Swiss-Prot record:
GO biological process: translation
Stated name of the protein: Small ribosomal subunit protein uS7
HAMAP family in alphabetical order: Ribosomal_uS7_B (MF_00480_B)
Gene name tied to this protein: rpsG
Keyword Chaperone recorded: no
Length: 156
């Protein structure tokens, strides 16, 4: 363990077009092989598609989508006397944001549309409407936590 204390949190600067840290975090999640300009093109064109389809502010739609994906509970493994229990714990806000962005990008990549921008735009739209694979992932996570409620007294 480190003797220097907890590590400092990385501060994400807002993106240049929308001035939003959420969009900047999404760009960083889409990023592959250090090609940030390509990731920016993908995210900005996806947000343009969202604006065309909904005629609403794309950042507001993105935030609504992330709110629908964000988990409040998750299960963590805890070993007690030779048995491993899935213990439900509350998700801290920072981790909840990270998980929602991760699920959004992962399930966007798994979609079948032609370009990544289309996949991301459609996943954002589905999530903002409470549909899509990323929202289903949150529901599954909550179901797991609910099913293992009996082990809640093992939480740390």
């Amino acid at each position: 363990m480190s003797r220097k204390g907890p590590s400092k949190k990385h501060v994400v600067l807002p993106d240049p077009i929308y001035g939003s840290t959420v969009v900047a975090q999404l760009i960083n999640k889409i990023l592959l092989d250090g090609k940030k300009s390509i990731a920016e093109d993908i995210v900005y064109s996806a947000l343009d598609m969202v604006k065309e389809k909904t005629e609403q502010e794309p950042v507001a739609v993105l935030k609504r989508a992330l709110d629908n994906i964000r988990p409040s509970l998750e299960v963590r493994s805890r070993r007690v006397g030779g048995a491993t229990y899935q213990v439900p714990v509350e998700v801290k806000p920072n981790r909840a944001n990270t998980l929602s962005l991760r699920w959004l990008t992962d399930f966007s990549r798994a979609r079948r549309e032609k370009t990544m921008a289309e996949r991301l735009a459609n996943e954002i739209l589905d999530a903002s409407n409470g549909l899509g694979a990323s929202v289903k992932r949150r529901e599954d996570t909550h179901k797991m936590a609910e099913a293992n409620k009996a082990f809640a007294h093992y939480r740390w």
